[in-house]
Amino acid sequence: LDRNGLRPARYYVTTDDRVIMASEVGVVNENAENIRAKGRLEPGKMLLIDTEEQRIISDEEIKQRVATELPYDEWVKEHVIHLSEITQADESDIPKVDDLFKKQQAFGYTQEDLVRMIVPMAKDGKDPVGAMGADAPLAILSDKPQLLYSYFKQMFAQVTNPPIDSIREEMVTSTRVMLGNSGNLTDPNKAGTYALSMRTPILTNQELASIKALDCRRMKSVTLPILFDPTKGADGLRDALNELCEKAEEAARTEQNVLILSDRGVDENHAPIPALLAVAAVHNHLIRKVLRTEIGLILESGEPREVHHFCTLIGYGVTAINPYLALETVRDLQARKRLGDITPEQAEKNYIKAAVGGIMKVMSKMGISTVRSYHGAQIFEALGLNTNFINKFFVNTPTRIGGIGLVGVANEALARYDRAFKSDESVLEPGGWYGPVKDGEEHLFNPKTIDLLQESLINGDYAKYKEYSKAIRNDYHVTLRSLMELNYPVGGGIPIEEVEPEESIVKRFKAGAMSYGAISKEAHETIAIAMNRLGSTSNSGEGGEDVARFKPLPNGDSMNSEVKQIASGRFGVTANYLIHAKELQIKCAQGAKPGEGGQLPGKKVYPETGKARHSTPGVELVSPPPHHDIYSIEDLAE
């Protein structure tokens, strides 16, 4: 059974030596007097039916037999080194970052990165939470240079493979990683068991310096630069990648068992290879050469700084990451009193804690509970990268719409390099991905469109509303759908008398599920009234509804949502709530952040919101990623 115990496995042993196993009791009818023994598998346990010996072999016996075949215990004691036990490097051995601002520019840091991401992570030790729609451009549609990570979207699990609750099920998760030669499971021997055990995949500068200094018990590292000549453009990037892969292959064929990819040498003459591209190129090249398990992979880079960056890097093959520039930025922010009353060491510790917690949350979206299982899994989809580029560097990653290739990636890297070393800019770019800012990313909902919408509502001006809808549709091409047009037939459409009338069509419309609390009381009620007038249906979302809305208004309008949603937090779900629905909707994934559950910040839980949700006002409300009583298709059917 899986380590989480999510897949039930119950069994009977009958008096005539039959074994009946199923996910539920009663799948096969059997008289009670015929049952000699019964039981269920516990998380991580095994059951083996030996048809030759005519008996069931228990979990303990199976594992005891395997564990004693070879001296694994001795091998582990002799050949596994724990990072916490090795001699720590001196402060003088840790490289310093010269000209922090220039390096931040070269790696595409923005003011938003500092304020919205790094400060909360270093101050609070948590991955920051936001509450708004994503109306910024896809990476391929942005007019700003994009980091390569932005072209990859995380995949997630639903009913057949439920996500894990990384908070409530933390006991079954593990962030520990093993660095070095992975050995050969089909031919186990001592030579292949040397490894360095690390508590998390995020390394401090001191920890990496200690690993670099390690040259004992067959743990040796080699550092390769991930830099290219900016004067040669895309050709320079291509040549640098080819040389990198050749040197990585050479290292894997020698006695080195730790390969460190480093971009610390960035300067006026050297631009950084995008870290994700370097990692994926080396990882897949070594796989093609059947050498990947011969060597561990560490990234020493100034580029990654947020959770999605770390996840893509681990997913495409890196074992551990030293985000040296992010850590240096944390210390700089602390020195400038931007993090409150905490020490530099505590700020760095908080940042790493937030990063690791975020990695666990993303892994849990796929039902994966250990970093070692997520490592190299490539559970992403590319959006805006062409097939040739993907097939060479990101093998087997889905990419459906095409897009840029190595030349485009090189141009974006060079744009960041030029800003750092060929301009006299004195401030970081604003960013603006999380909200509209001057000279930042475009947004569908920006001052112009919001002003048009508000003016149309305040004045009841339909012409203004049409201006607003036209601006949303035509002026800001930030989504794929905004690029599409209907191909109307030449000579006009279908005669109006041959098509279904509007009144009939709208009855099949359903409003999106937005909870009361996520949107205001007025908006939630207005949507319900409008949909009921049309004969369509509105959806309550997961936040319950005030019982007063279940009764019609004096003018005949109804504020009752005919579709009632049941989410994993069960907020507002009562018998009265359920009986006033025409349709019940069990929400298995959050549309805005699938696999993560729901989260309503405490500041949005007003007294009326708390009343509808049967919760305490001002207290943050979290719906766990899975329903804790729905872990299979069978559970959902029940």
Annotated model-derived regions:
Residues L1-I20:
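Conserved catalytic micro-motifs used in adenylation/nucleotidyl-transfer and phosphoryl/amide-
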Residues S23-V27, R55-L237, K247-A251, E255-V258, ...:
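Flexible, glycine-rich loop/tail regions that form catalytic "lids" or insertion modules at the edges
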Residues L261-L277, V547, V619-P626:
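Glycine-rich, proline-tolerant flexible connector loops at the mouths of alpha/beta enzymes
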Residues I273-L297, N350-A355:
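Alpha-helix-loop-beta-strand connector modules within alpha/beta enzyme cores
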Residues P230-G233, E246-V258, R264-D267, N284-L291, ...:
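Conserved helix-loop functional segments at active or binding sites
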